[in-house]
From Swiss-Prot:
Pfam short name (any one): OSCP
Protein name: ATP synthase subunit delta
Principal location listed in the UniProt entry: membrane
Keywords: ATP synthesis, Cell inner membrane, Cell membrane, CF(1), Hydrogen ion transport, Ion transport, Membrane, Transport
Gene Ontology cellular component terms for the protein in this record: plasma membrane; proton-transporting ATP synthase complex
Function: F(1)F(0) ATP synthase produces ATP from ADP in the presence of a proton or sodium gradient. F-type ATPases consist of two structural domains, F(1) containing the extramembraneous catalytic core and F(0) containing the membrane proton channel, linked together by a central stalk and a peripheral stalk. During catalysis, ATP synthesis in the catalytic domain of F(1) is coupled via a rotary mechanism of the central stalk subunits to proton translocation.
Topology term for the membrane: Peripheral membrane protein
Amino acid sequence: MSELTTIARPYAKAAFDFAVEQSATDKSAVEKWTEMLGFAAQVADNEQIRDFFANTFSVQKAADAMVSICGEQLDQYGQNLIRLMAENKRLTVLPAVFDEFQRYVEEHNATAEVQVISAQPLNATQEQKIAAAMEKRLARKVKLNCSVDNSLLAGVIIRTDDFVIDGSSRGQLNRLANELQ
């Protein structure tokens, strides 16, 4: 996966920098680019489309097909990015480009995505407390993605891109079992 990230990063950075530059005149430019790249990434991630890219020897055909499928979803600059990526035989990394682009947007907006897995559904107060604690620790706004996993027994697991906090009973029991061995 790190190879894909390495390949995708320059495309994502260029698209992000261009979107930020455009946002001086169009406040929704970053959101538009997020939508364009998200749609193109979904198309490129389709199994039939990936097979087509793998078996197409013409760069022009691959680019034209992708632009045609995406249609009105891409503006002229989005189409230029698709054509450049096709020319470099990188259309298959569009999903990774989208992921990297989203990371740049999160950094730019000073937000972080935090996954919270709990044994029981969290109420609004608990979510607010976790969000406040994570905002303080990360020094940025957080977006919580909460889910329930009954196998935790009790407690929560909090995950970000940088670290994991395992405050679950299952995690504590596993650590205790490892210490006793």
